Structure formats: structure tokens, C-alpha cells
From Swiss-Prot:
The keyword Ribosomal protein applies. The gene is rplO. Part of the 50S ribosomal subunit. GO terms for biological process: translation. Binds to the 23S rRNA. Residues 23-33 have a biased composition (Gly residues). The lineage of its organism: Bacteria, Pseudomonadati, Pseudomonadota, Gammaproteobacteria, Lysobacterales. GO terms for molecular function: rRNA binding; structural constituent of ribosome. InterPro entries: Ribosomal_uL15, Ribosomal_uL15/eL18, Ribosomal_uL15/eL18_sf, Ribosomal_uL15_bac-type, Ribosomal_uL15_CS. Residues 1-20 have a biased composition (Basic and acidic residues). Keywords: Ribonucleoprotein, Ribosomal protein, RNA-binding, rRNA-binding. This is Large ribosomal subunit protein uL15.
Length: 147
């Protein structure tokens, strides 16, 4: 038998007819049409409740107290420890390089190098502050600090 376009049909079970609900007791989905009896889910538009609505109980966002705020006086300077700096490649280090290396959080506007650990590479700091101890360690390793 040859295959013809007019003989093509989908495989068995590939296309099922949409179940029509509320069309008589014999269908198995008559009367309440699978919605049960009464309640919000039985009504049209039922089940659509606001996010955070807890059925009339005081919702979580109103039960818990308000906490904290973002202070305008907050420190916007990130501390970078000298041993973290040593993980970078030797050379020029500026604020953008520190941010690219994920040593400075995105909220910080400035950075300051703090001495902790040893420095083995030569760094030239540009536009980054350093403590007196960190400055001495950088210069001892052959680097410099330009503010």
C-alpha cells in the first residue's frame, strides 16, 4: 500500500478532545462541573486571591514589625585586605580593577587597602586609599600609592 497525503492521520492518543464540563450527569462532570460545592473556588473568578492574603487573618507583612533602613550616613568605603590584593596580577590597581575582581561590593563608592598578611607582588595603587601599614607594605614590595 502506498502512502498518500489523504491517508495521513495523527497517531492514536496524540489528539484528545477537550472535556466539556457541566453537560449532564452521564458525563461524570455534570452539575458542579468538577468545582465542588460552594466556596470561592466554585464561583466564577474564584481562586484569584491577592498575594499575601491569608483568608482574613492578619497577613505576615502586617504582623511583623518594620525593621531597619538605609542610612544616608552609612560607610560607602569598602575594605580590601592586602592578602586579597595579592591574588590580583601585579601592576596598576584602581577601583574598577578591584570591582572587576569582586573584591568590592557593588554598593561601595570607594575602597581602602588594609594591611593583613603578606604582599609578594608589585602594585601601583591609583585612586584607592591605603592605611599607613598597607602603604608601607606596598612600597616595601616595590610598588607605590598614588592618591
Amino acid at each position: 500500500m502506498t502512502l498518500r497525503l489523504n491517508d495521513l492521520k495523527p497517531a492514536d492518543g496524540a489528539r484528545t478532545e477537550r472535556t466539556r464540563v457541566g453537560r449532564g450527569i452521564g458525563s461524570g462532570l455534570g452539575k458542579t462541573a468538577g468545582r465542588g460545592h460552594k466556596g470561592s473556588f466554585a464561583r466564577k473568578g474564584g481562586g484569584k486571591i491577592k498575594a499575601g492574603f491569608e483568608g482574613g487573618q492578619t497577613p505576615m507583612q502586617r504582623r511583623l514589625p518594620k525593621i531597619g533602613f538605609r542610612s544616608k550616613m552609612a560607610r560607602d568605603t569598602a575594605e580590601v585586605l592586602s592578602y586579597q590584593l595579592d591574588k590580583l596580577d601585579a601592576g596598576d590597581v584602581d577601583f574598577a580593577a578591584l570591582r572587576a575582581a569582586n573584591l568590592v561590593p557593588s554598593r561601595a563608592k570607594k575602597a581602602k587597602i588594609v594591611l593583613k598578611g603578606e604582599l609578594s607582588k608589585k602594585f601601583v595603587l591609583k585612586g584607592v586609599a591605603a592605611t599607613a601599614g598597607a602603604k608601607a607594605a606596598i612600597e616595601a614590595a616595590g610598588g607605590s600609592v598614588e592618591e
